[in-house]
């Protein structure tokens, strides 16, 4: 990866997938604590279930900057305001992508994959770019927390090169 005028440097990407983790909050807590980008696709459970913010404490989040995408039906109603107070630094360290409408499950994987590809594409994607890439489910998405970001993709030159080793 190369940022601005810095010398290029190596970095690692680790992708964790969980399938069928719909009753226990343990895998979600592990993923939240150990990720810079957390992407969830599944039921919002009407605000209850394993992702209920009441199941989490500030200790379940890293101190680093983090993006969380809660790709479930009307997830904005259940998650947009409750995770932010749990995160050290609030919106300076957490951007939360949520859906205002129902998100059809049959296109969710495609939308999540396109979001991730745009994020890791090697350029400097803005949230507009990321949301346009993930529009397959057209769930009226919103990003909370981006207004006070220090990093601005339009002001930084980041280049990611993927090599096979």
Regions found by a protein language model. Name each.
Residues 1-75:
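Catalytic-core segments of thiol-dependent peptidases
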Residues 67-165:
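Active-site-proximal C-terminal subdomain of hydrolase catalytic domains
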């Amino acid at each position: 990866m190369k940022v601005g005028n810095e010398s290029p440097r190596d970095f690692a990407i680790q992708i964790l997938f969980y399938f069928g983790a719909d009753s226990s909050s343990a895998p979600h807590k592990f993923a939240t604590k150990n990720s810079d980008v957390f992407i969830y696709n599944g039921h919002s459970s009407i605000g209850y279930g394993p992702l209920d913010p009441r199941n989490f404490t500030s200790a379940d989040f890293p101190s680093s900057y983090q993006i969380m995408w809660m790709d479930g039906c009307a997830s904005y109603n259940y998650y947009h305001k409750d995770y932010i107070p749990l995160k050290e630094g609030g919106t300076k360290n957490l951007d939360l992508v949520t859906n205002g409408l129902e998100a059809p499950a049959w296109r969710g994987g495609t939308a999540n994959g396109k979001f991730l590809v745009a994020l890791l594409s090697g350029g400097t994607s803005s949230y507009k770019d990321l949301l346009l890439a993930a529009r397959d489910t057209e769930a009226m998405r919103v990003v909370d927390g981006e207004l006070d970001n220090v990093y601005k993709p339009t002001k930084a030159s980041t280049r990611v090169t993927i090599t096979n080793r």
